[in-house]
Structures are given as structure tokens and as C-alpha cells.
Amino acid sequence: KKRHEMPPHIYAIADTAYRSMLQDREDQSILCTGESGAGKTENTKKVIQYLAVVASSHKGKKDSSITQGPSFAYGELEKQLLQANPILEAFGNAKTVKNDNSSRFGKFIRINFDVTGYIVGANIETYLLEKSRAIRHARDERTFHIFYYLIAGAKEKMRNDLLLESFNSYTFLSNGFVPIPAAQDDEMFQETLEAMSIMGFSEEEQLAILKVVSSVLQLGNIVFKKERNTDQASMPDNTAAQKVCHLVGINVTDFTRAILTPRIKVGRDVVQKAQTKEQADFAIEALAKATYERLFRWILSRVNKALDKTHRQGASFLGILDIAGFEIFEVNSFEQLCINYTNEKLQQLFNHTMFILEQEEYQREGIEWNFIDFGLDLQPCIELIERPNNPPGVLALLDEECWFPKATDKSFVEKLCSEQGNHPKFQKPKQLKDKTEFSIIHYAGKVDYNASAWLTKNMDPLNDNVTSLLNASSDKFVADLWKDVDRIVGLDQMAKMTESSLPSASKTKKGMFRTVGQLYKEQLGKLMTTLRNTTPNFVRCIIPNHEKRSGKLDAFLVLEQLRCNGVLEGIRICRQGFPNRIVFQEFRQRYEILAANAIPKGFMDGKQACILMIKALELDPNLYRIGQSKIFFRTGVLAHLEEERDLKITDVIMAFQAMCRGYLARKAFTKRQQQLTASKVIQRNCAAYLKLRNWQWWRLFTKVKPLDEEMEAKQNLERHVSTLNIQLSDSKKKLQDLASTIEVMEEGKKRLQKEMEGLGQQYEEKAAAYDKLEKTKNRLQQELDDLVVDLDNQRQLVSNLEKKQKKFDQLLAEEKNISSKYADERDRAEAEAREKETKALSLARALEEALEAKEELERTNKMLKAEMEDLVSSKDDVGKNVHELEKSKRALETQMEEMRTQLEELEDELQATEDAKLRLEVNMQALKGQFERDLQARDEQNEEKRRQLQRQLHEYETELEDERKQRALAAAAKKKLEGDLKDLELQADSAVKGREEAIKQLRKLQAQMKDFQRELDDARASRDEIFATSKENEKKAKSLEAELMQLQEDLAAAERARKQADLEKEELAEELASSLSGRNTLQDEKRRLEARIAQLEEELEEEQGNMEAMSDRVRKATLQAEQLSNELVTERSAAQKNESARQQLERQNKELRSKLQEVEGAVKAKLKSTVAALEAKIVQLEEQIEQEAREKQAATKLLKQKDKKLKEVLLQVEDERKMVEQYKEQAEKGNTKVKQLKRQLEEAEEESQRINANRRKLQRELDEATESNEAMGREVNALKSKLRRGNEASFVPSRRAGGRRVIENTDGSEEEMDARDSDFNGTKASE
């Protein structure tokens, strides 16, 4: 089957992403999303396995350690990439109700590839580890796998080292041992250790990790109890604490003290605060969660370090995202909000890719398309969660509440409801179980969140006393885990959360820690940026049922998931739109075979060609659209075209195969015919041979022919021996001649070398003289430049002084303006002070009125108390009225107490305002005097400085006139020096020209010396070659003589002679081959010898048995000797030519020497005259320089004087500037003081307003109390009249009984009266 006909497969998606990355050079990402248990982690592992096989750089190597099949092989990096998952699963996965291997964290695996497609590294980022699972989990669930692996798989020695116990001994393993079907914890423990070893974890690191895991379990066994008489917590048994401290390397006493009585910084003081049992338990649980989280982060960084150790550069990457899907539980907390927020962002990316970008491409390509709104805009829900302000979202409000004093989860929800109550995606549940609940409408449905403990989770507080201990642990691994303790929220910061004296608590200061929400939001933002910069490939994992059963499909559940994640809408747009598209050039190239005759020959635009092809294919116009750069098709059209193309290609291939088979059959037939003809020829030849083999003359001919060939070969060998002897003698003579020639040439070479050394010394002396003249010229030029620079500096100084005079005048004018401004400000401050005095007097009068009202209320209170005592001692039938009077009395007493406290506060505020008024008056007087003194002193100083500056200006004018005169003298001297310098330059140029001519002559001589040297080397090489050839010729001659004697002695043994001749022929061939590097004549001789050897072989075979060939061989050898003698004559003539060339070179050398001597003489004469003239010029210049030096000294003295004066002026100006700055500072201080006084006056006004409000309130309460008092007086008068009419005899006992009843009633209804008093006070407060 073809790929598009196959059902979807995770390998196909991974392969598509991998191929797209290589072809398009674009980064890819694979997003695995879905519910818990849907298979996200398994699909992620399958993708990594596939890429490790396809993109491995060790495909040809065998590796038996980790193989997924008989043909799979991985390199070290690929093995580590595969083994990263088991480690992360052991520490980050757990068994839940829905999934036996549920990932309790999200991860983004980034695999880097080089330009060839091989894996060069990887990196893993994690999100939202559910660290709370380390301390508690639901029923029938497990905590992280590593705890069970460690207890089940540790051996005896490890159990003793890590202080391990059974499953039921640990509080954090509340459900005990919960097995997982088809998984053994002890085997998984060994697999985890092996994976760590492959990742490069040392044994010490593995043991340190397991120690931390064991310490987390032991933390859960620490038990606290509440002491009897106090709320303070105590630790009756510290066995578990001792085990924890032993495992993490800290002192148990310090650990216990840090938990039970930690040190907290309050202001500048450090105090010890006793913790309650609940606080101690919370600290231990927070420490366990933080320890496990830090361990997980350390393992992740260690894994990333192992995966990124290669130094090869990554060209592109493929990212795999495995993150928790949308979660709706019975109780949804902060973790669920973060997970659902992440899924909202991912779903928005999916919608944007599938719907928005798809339809935008239709519009961009100019296709007629009505934009379809699929109703999947998730931006409102995302803004509800992440919006920073106007109005702030959930995360921003949570961060704000974390820093707000006395903030609670309830206040956070209330503020959220007030800010976002009208948001379409926010709802408040109708039936509230708790005041910390709210609802958000996500794309997958409405989710009810419970904000309980959200502030704590967002702050993630820890006991900083314990973290400091862990940071200083004796165990290096533990200390490394806790190295960043400065970013921890400590107990003192949490204590400040409950104080009201924290005005700036809602603002996060620079350098302080960042909340969990902030960090996760930034991390998610980086992830989304990475995903947007890649080409996404979505893998939607669908869970078939919630029962973990295979083969069962819950249709409603599957459809709900497809609806929530946008798959149904994606199918809809695929059906309505044109999901398949292909660029014009590719469409033409691929499907032109279907319309071969539709496109004419020659160039044609790609779009026009595609239109012609579509017409030829007769496609329905509803099935395609032609855009600007692509052609779009509906679903299935391209597949149909692909099938037709396959059929067409099949027909073409079949026709091609038929032609090939016909050609091969015809070729085989022709070959068969040729074989038949050849067999007939062979048959005829065999018949002829059978007739000849019995003929006697034929037998004689076959026996005689080999003897003739052998005799001819012997003759050729003899001739060759004689020729070689002659060559040997000639070569010896040539060798002697060349040796003498080489000796003569070596002597000439030595003589020339000595002459060259002498010339070199002379050249160096002349170069030194020239350099000396050049230095003298440069020194004079430098002195001249210095004088010019000094003149420019003097001009600059004068101009600077003039500018400073102008600036000083401007400063004086500015100072006068500032002094006038200060006077105006002083007047305004005095006016404000007088206004505040009047306000303070009005406040004092208001206070006196309040005191009088207070005294009047106290008198009224005393009167009421006396009347109450009389009424209590009255008759028992008035007990009920007395009880009501007692209640009103208590209410009045509470009112009196409140009024008394308010009066005390008013008195304190009045006293504070009086103190502020006095301070203001004192400050105003001091400022006034200071301003007047400063202004007077400044005016005097300015006048004095103005006079000094005028005097200095006159002095500068006189000095400037002197400077102008000196400048004119210096200009004249400069012109004179420039003329002298030009003369020196002309003389130096002539010397340079002479020097260059000498250098040219010297270079010519050096070139001739090199030629002589080259010729001498050639002669030596030829001599060595001749020596070598002569030795070889001697050897050859000796061998040929021996062969000649042997042939003369035994001519009858023809066969043996032929073999010896063959051997000698091979030796001669080797010797001739070794002489390939000889001269041209010897090479010609070699070729002739090879031809002779071939001829000897032929003659030896033809003339075998011929005894007379011996004389012919001798004659031929004589001829060969004559030829060698001729060649020797030519060699001698060549040697004579070489000798004559050498003599000619010697003559040229002598001529050049004579020319060199003449040139040297001329150069010396020129140099002597030039040096004499230059010396005279130098003496003259030295005199001029001395005169100029004296003038320069005088000028420097004047400059020093002027510098001193200038420094004094500058110091004075600097003093003036400092004084101005001081005045500005004083003015600023005065402004700040005035502002402070204004603020104090405003505060005093606010206090007075508040006092007036309190006074009006007290007046109203006093009026009410007066009215109630009058009512009570009327009631008392009525009771007195009743008492007078009563019976006198029964008055005493009834009064006693009534008194007792009144007392009992009072005691019994005390709580009721308190409740009514509180209601009364609340009513007053609301009024």
C-alpha cells in the first residue's frame, strides 16, 4: 500500500516531521496532547525511538547493549537519549486512578540535528512537577515510583546505608505498598540504576540521590506534639530527625531548634519564635516538597548536561511536547489552573494553525472564500488568566495578594470577583460550599476552582533557618542542591505578611524572589514562542475508556474529546476547503505525464502550464482552485491524480520492458548464429590438422625450427657483451674528466663567496651612514613641529580665557536671578506659615470645646450612676426596669470609654500639630536668617571677584601682546629652518639614488652567483650519474664475459643455454630500468639494448643448433663497440662545451668585479662630498637649534608664568562654581523643607478635619445619650411615685429577694447583654 492509504501511525508523523526538517530546513515540533492515560508519554517514547534509529550516526556499527530489534544499533548519544525517559519516569511518574504510569510533570524534549540529519544533542525542559504528591496522595494511588523502587530493590548493604524500612513504616506512603500490574518494582530499580550509569551518573552521585530520596521519606516520620499549657510544639522522639540529619549531613540539635524555635528578623532585631504544632508540620512538609523538587531539577540538569556534551553544531531541531491535558476534578486547585491555562494556549496555537492560517492563505492566494468563524477564539479566557492590568487577571491578582498585608485566599477571591465579575468567561458559583470558590469557562467546559491555600502555593514559603543549615551541609551534594537559598521566602517575610505596617508590600522590589505563577507564565511564554517559530505537528491522544480495559470504546467519551480539542472542526474545514496544495512547478513536473501533449514546446509560465494541464485532465471546476503561486485541491483529488499517474507510469514501464526484452532476444539470436559459424570453422581446422600430423616432413620442420632461434639468440648476446665493454671504458674516462672540472668550479665558487662578503660589509657601512642622516633630518623636523604646536597652544589658551570671562559674566547674572527667586520663595513660605498658625488656633479652640463636652458627659455619667444605685436598692417589682437600666448603663459606659479614647487621641494629635507648628516656626526663622546672610556674603564675594577678574584681564592683554611679538620671531625662524630642511632633503635624495644604484649592482652579482651555483650543482649531478652508469657497465661486462665462456664451452646444451639467456635478459632489463635517470644518450642506448634483447630472443629460437653463428655474434659485438666509441666522442665534446661555458662565466665574473669596484669608488667619492656638506650644514643647524632652544626656554618661562596665573583663575572659577552649587543645594534644601512644611500643614489640616468629624460624631452621641438620660429620668420619677404608694411593711424582705434576683438575672444574661452591646456598637459604627 501507499503511504496515504495507510492508517495514521506515530512513526509516519515522526518521519514526516523529520523529512520536512531536512528538506525545508525549518524547525519542527510534535505536540502530544490529551487526557491523562491517553498515551502521550508512550507516543513520545515511540517518536524518540524512531528518531534514534533513523537519525543515528552509528548505523553501521553493532551494539548489543541496547537494541530494539535484530537490526537496530545506536551510538552513545542515542542510547543516552533513550535512557533519559526511564530516569525521568522513575522520579516524575506515579500511579493514579486513570493511569498506572501517569506523568506528573510536563516536558519539552528538544532534539538537535546537524545539516546531514544526524542527532548531535538534546535538551529537556520540564513544567509543573506535582511535588505535593511526595507527601500525600489519594486512595488507591501511589507517590512517585522511585520511593517504591528504592524500598523494593535496594540490597542489604544499601538498606543499611540509607536507613530504609518497610513500606508501612513511612507516613508519606499512606497507602502502603500498592502494586502495579505487569511491573516489578525491584526490576525497575535495577533498570533505573543502569539508565543512570549509561547517562554518566557516577556511583557516588547515584548514592547521593538515593540518600536524598530516603531523607524525604524520613521527614514524614517526624512527629510533633502540642505541650500541655501552651500552644508550642515539641518533638518527644527525635529518632526520625536523627536519621534525616545523618542522611543530609547536618547537626540534629540545630535542625530541631530551626524547626521548633526558628530565628526571625523583626526590624533590625533577630528573635526566636516558638512554633505551634501546625506550623511545625507545615514546615516539615514544605521542606520535603522543596527537597524533592530540587532533586528532580538537579537530575534534569545532569541529564541535559550528558545530552549536550557534543561539540557539533546543530543546524535545526525537532521538539516533542508531552504535557498534561485538560483536567476537571471534583476539587480543582492552583495546579489545575496552570495546566488548563497551558492547554488553552496550546489549543489556541492549534486553532490558529488549522483555521486562521489556513483561511488566511486562501485569501492571500486570491481564492474565492467566505471566512468561516468556527467559534474557537480562546483569547478572552487566556486574558482572564494572564492579563497584567486594566483589569488584572487571575495570576496578576494572585501575585498582588501575595504581597498585600493581611491578605487571605478569601480576600483574593473577593477582589477577583470585583475585578472580573462581568467577564463572560468568569462565573461565581450559585451554591457556594466555600467562600474561596470561583468558576472559569474553558474551551472544554466550565471548571470550578477552589482557591484554598493558593497564596501559600504561589509564594512557596520555606523555613529559611533549615535551608541555611542545608546550604552549609557537610554533604557536597546536599549543599549543591540548596545553593540558591537567597531566593527563598523565609519566615520573616511570611511574618511581615500579617503586619499592617507594610505600606509597600504590594510592590515587588528589585532582587526579591519571583512567585510560582510569574515563573510559570514566563516559562510558558518561552515555550509558546519556540512552538510558534516551528512547524507544528499535532498528535491528539484519545482515551477510549476510563476503566483501563482494552478493546472497549466509549463513543460518547471519544466524541467529547474530539469536540474539545478541535478535531471535528478540523475535519469540517478539510471537507469545505482545499487542504491539498502544490506549487505550480512541482505540479507540472509531477503530473505532466498525464497531459503530455497539452503543453507546447518552448518556455511557458508555470501558472499557464498548470491551467492547460487541468483543462486536458478535464477536472471538475469545483474540485480545484488556482492561486497566485499554488494550485489547491479538495480532499482526494491529488490521491486520484496520483493513482492515474501510477497507472500511466506502469504502462510506460511495461512498454519499455517489452522493448528491452525484444532487444535482448535479438542479441541472443545473433550471438547464437556467430557461435554456429565458429564451430564449423573449428571442425574444418581439426580435420586439416589430423591429415598433417602423420606427415614426416612436418615432424622434421617442427624439430629444426627451435634450434635456429636459439643460435640467433646466442649471437645477439655476444654482440651485446662487446658493446657493453666499450661503454664501460668510455664511462671511466668521462668520470675522470668531470671530477677535475668540478674541483676547478668549487675553487671559483669559494673565491666568489669571499668577494660577496666584502661587498656586503661595504653595503652595510653605507646604509648606516644613510640612516644617521635620516635620523638627523627627522629630529630637526620634530623640533620644528613642536614649536608650531606650542604656538597653537598659546593661541588656544588666550581664546579659552576670553570664553571663561564671558561664562563668568553669565554666572553672575544667573546668581542675581536665583537670589531674587529665593526672596520670593521666602515671602511665600512666611505667608503659608501665618495661614497654618490660624489653622492651629482654630484646632485648639475645637479641642477646648471637645474637652468641655467631655466634662459635661462625665458629670452626667456620675449622676446616672447615683440614680442607678438608688434604683437597685428599690423594690423587687421594679427588677425588670432596673435590668434594662443596667443595660443602658453599660452601653453608656462603653460610649464613655470610646469617647475618652477619642479625646486622648485628639489631645495627642493636637500636641503633635503644636510641635509641628513650633518646628515650622524655628525652621522658617533659621532659613530666613541663613538666606539673608548668604545673599549678603555672595554679593560681597561677587564684587571682589569682578574686580580681580578685571585686573587679570588687563594683565592677560599685555601678555597677549608680548606673545604676538614672540610668535612673529618664531615664524621667521620657522621659515629659515624650512629652507635649510629642503637643502638637506635634496642632499639626502642624491645619497639615496647612489645607494639604490649600488644595491642594483649587488643584486646582479648575487643573481650571477646563483647561476654559477646552479651550473655547479648540475655538473655534480652529471658526475654522479656517470659514476653510477660506469659501475653498472662494469658489472654487466663481467657478467657477459662469464656467459660468453660458458656458451663457447657448452654449445650442445641448447635448452640450458636458452634458459640462461632468459635469466641474463631479465637481469639486463632490470639494470637498464635502473638507469632511467641517466642522460639522454644513455636512455637512447637503453631503448636500443631492449630492441636488441628482443632480437636476440628471436634469433636464439630460430638458429638453435647452428654452430656457425658464433662468428656472426663476434662481428656484431665489434660493430656495437664502434657505436659506443662514437657515443663516447660525443660525450667528450659535450664536456669540452661545458668547460668553455665555465671559462666564459669566469671572465664575466671578473668584468663584473671591475665594474663593482668602479661603482664603489664613485659612490665613495659622492658620499664623502655629501657627508662633508652635511656635516657643515649640521654644525650650522646646531647653532641655530641652540639659539632656538634659548628662545624656547624664554618662551617656556613665560608659558609657566601664564600657566600659574591661569591655574589661579581656574581655581577661582572653580570656587565660584562650588559656591554656586552650594547655593543651589541650599535652595533645593529650602524647597524640600518648604515642601515638607506644606505636607505637614496638609496633614495637620486633614487631622483637624478628622477631629471635627469625630467631634460632630461625639456631639451626636452626646445628644442621644442626653435624650436617653431624660427618658430614664422620667422612668425613675414614675418608679419613685409608685414606691411611695407601696406597702412599707413588706419592703425590706422583698427588696433583698429582688436584689438577689437582679444579681442572678444579671449574671445569667451577661452573654446576652454582651451580644446586645456588640449589636449596639455595630449599629453605631454603621451610622
Swiss-Prot record:
It comes from the Eukaryota. The modification Phosphothreonine is found at residue 1306. The modification Phosphoserine is found at residues 1039, 1077, 1309, 1326. GO terms for molecular function: actin filament binding; ATP binding; calmodulin binding; cytoskeletal motor activity; microfilament motor activity; structural constituent of muscle. Both isoform 1 and isoform 2 are detected in small and large intestine, uterus, bladder, aorta, stomach, and at much lower levels in lung. All three isoforms are coexpressed in smooth muscle. Isoform 2 predominates in most of the smooth muscles tested, with the exception of intestine and urinary bladder, which show greater expression of isoform 1. The keyword Transmembrane does not apply. SUPFAM superfamilies: Myosin rod fragments (SSF90257), P-loop containing nucleoside triphosphate hydrolases (SSF52540). Residues 1127-1143 have a biased composition (Polar residues). Residues 1222-1231 have a biased composition (Basic and acidic residues). Signal peptide: none annotated. GO terms for biological process: actin filament organization; cardiac muscle cell development; elastic fiber assembly; smooth muscle contraction. Keywords: Actin-binding, ATP-binding, Calmodulin-binding, Coiled coil, Cytoplasm, Motor protein, Muscle protein, Myosin, Nucleotide-binding, Phosphoprotein, Thick filament. Residues 1127-1149, 1222-1327 are annotated as: Disordered. Residues 524-546, 625-639 are annotated as: Actin-binding. Residues 1-646 form the Myosin motor domain. Residues 649-678 form the IQ domain. It is found in: Melanosome; Cytoplasm, Myofibril. InterPro entries: Kinesin_motor_dom_sf, Myosin_head_motor_dom-like, Myosin_tail, P-loop_NTPase. The rodlike tail sequence is highly repetitive, showing cycles of a 28-residue repeat pattern composed of 4 heptapeptides, characteristic for alpha-helical coiled coils. Limited proteolysis of myosin heavy chain produces 1 light meromyosin (LMM) and 1 heavy meromyosin (HMM). HMM can be further cleaved into 2 globular subfragments (S1) and 1 rod-shaped subfragment (S2). Belongs to the TRAFAC class myosin-kinesin ATPase superfamily. Myosin family. Muscle myosin is a hexameric protein that consists of 2 heavy chain subunits (MHC), 2 alkali light chain subunits (MLC) and 2 regulatory light chain subunits (MLC-2). Muscle contraction. This is Myosin-11.
